[in-house]
């Protein structure tokens, strides 16, 4: 869910997820669409399948561990984990000018 995703992003990047990524670029946030503005925005672009059910995870030794017996929920958790790690790995591309990018200007 968005709650777990937000926690993962905070843990991986140290950034406030809503403030830093809630409207970042063309693809981060609820109305995300269009060509990614940079590598950070591309992380959100590939993360379009993860919003459905709530799942649980733990934070052990600075690593996200998805611990579900339900394979569907584990897959959702792994998807959120992947975007959180992608955002951390691309912190160097984070550009404040895209923080509140207007989605209508994004091209499909």
From Swiss-Prot:
Site (Hydrophobic membrane-disruption site (MDiS)): 102, 105
GO cellular component: extracellular region
Alphabetized GO MF terms: calcium ion binding; calcium-dependent phospholipase A2 activity; phospholipid binding; toxin activity
Subunit note: Probable homodimer; non-covalently-linked. A model of myotoxic mechanism has been proposed: an apo Lys49-PLA2 is activated by the entrance of a hydrophobic molecule (e.g. fatty acid) at the hydrophobic channel of the protein leading to a reorientation of a monomer. This reorientation causes a transition between 'inactive' to 'active' states, causing alignment of C-terminal and membrane-docking sites (MDoS) side-by-side and putting the membrane-disruption sites (MDiS) in the same plane, exposed to solvent and in a symmetric position for both monomers.
Function: Snake venom phospholipase A2 (PLA2) that lacks enzymatic inactivity, but induces myotoxicity. Also causes an inflammatory activity that is demonstrated by mice paw edema induction and pro-inflammatory cytokine IL-1 (but not TNF-alpha) elevation. Also shows antimicrobial activity against Gram-positive and Gram-negative bacteria.
Similarity comment text for this entry: Belongs to the phospholipase A2 family. Group II subfamily. K49 sub-subfamily.
Protein name (record): Basic phospholipase A2 homolog BnuTX-I
Organism: Bothrops neuwiedi urutu (Neuwied's lancehead)
Important for membrane-damaging activities in eukaryotes and bacteria: region residues: 96-108
Site (Important residue of the cationic membrane-docking site (MDoS)): 96, 99
UniProt keyword list: Antibiotic, Antimicrobial, Disulfide bond, Myotoxin, Secreted, Toxin
Compartments it resides in: Secreted
Disulfide bonds: 26-106, 28-44, 43-86, 50-79, 66-77
SMART domains xref list: PA2c
Site, as annotated: Cationic membrane-docking site (MDoS): 103, 108
Tissue-by-tissue expression: Expressed by the venom gland.
Pfam families: Phospholip_A2_1
Gene Ontology biological process terms in this record: arachidonate secretion; defense response to bacterium; lipid catabolic process; negative regulation of T cell proliferation; phospholipid metabolic process
């Amino acid at each position: 869910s968005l709650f777990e995703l937000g926690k993962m992003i905070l843990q991986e990047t140290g950034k406030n997820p809503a403030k830093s990524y809630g409207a970042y670029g063309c693809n981060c946030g609820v109305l995300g669409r269009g060509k990614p503005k940079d590598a950070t925005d591309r992380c959100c672009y590939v993360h379009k399948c993860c919003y459905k059910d709530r799942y649980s995870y733990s934070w052990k030794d600075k690593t996200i561990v998805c611990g579900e017996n339900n394979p569907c929920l584990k897959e959702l958790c792994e998807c959120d984990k992947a975007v959180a790690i992608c955002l951390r790995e691309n912190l160097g591309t984070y550009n404040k000018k895209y923080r509140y990018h207007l989605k209508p200007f994004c091209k499909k």
